[in-house]
Design a protein with these regions (language model features):
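Ligand-binding pockets and gating/stacking loops
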Residues: 1-199
Length: 199
């Protein structure tokens, strides 16, 4: 294999890389091709298929942990979703790897008692909604909020903080959106997240 000039670091680790040359697509429209790449199916009106990440998250959840099983980095508005697997298997989206994910830190004035009180109120409201015939949707919503609450309270939230990496390590990955995304992906995989995609 010949590696292009300027890719010397890649050449050094080629034994760790798999090159896929058999992947083709005859779909000319980008959105449909992206859907097929992520699900294995062309879009159809009747069925919304889950992305591969959602399937992996469903089959290999992180046991008793507070990190999501599927993280999608740098994909604002481009995620395919969890399809018929439900919202609990949807990707945890990180738009910008250089920042903590949106809405994961409690406000300074919000202590644990108030935080728990708000979650309790939410549970009461969801119970009322579920009794009106929306039980499946409420169960999905409850699972998402429970996961979010665990993450907000977790010491593992620092996994998302790539600023804690040395400047030298950040330079190795590159201080671009993609480079920062790959650095975050490495940190997540090291913590046991089974599926991470970087766009």
């Amino acid at each position: 294999i010949q590696i292009a000039e300027g890719w010397e670091n890649t050449a050094r680790v080629m034994k760790e890389i798999s090159i896929i040359r058999s992947m083709t697509n005859n779909v000319a429209e980008h959105t449909r091709a992206q859907y097929q790449l992520h699900t294995g199916y062309l879009p159809s009106g009747g069925v919304k298929y889950p992305t591969f990440g959602s399937i992996v998250a469903s089959d290999f959840p992180i046991p008793k942990d507070d990190l999501p099983s599927f993280v999608s980095i740098g994909t604002p508005g481009n995620t395919i979703g969890s399809g018929f697997l439900g919202m609990s298997q949807a990707p945890f989206v990180v738009n910008d790897a250089s920042k903590l994910p949106a809405n994961v830190s409690k406000a300074n004035r919000l202590d644990e008692q108030r935080f728990s009180g708000r979650l309790s109120l939410l549970e009461d409201l969801e119970g009322q909604y579920a009794n009106k015939g929306a039980k499946a949707r409420v169960e999905d919503h409850k699972a998402i909020y429970a996961n979010a609450a665990r993450l907000v309270r977790s010491p593992n939230l620092k996994t998302f903080d790539i600023a804690s990496e040395s400047n030298e390590m950040q330079e190795k990955y590159g201080k671009t959106a993609f480079g920062r995304g790959c650095l975050l992906a490495r940190r997540l995989v090291e913590r046991g997240v089974p599926f991470v995609e970087v766009e």
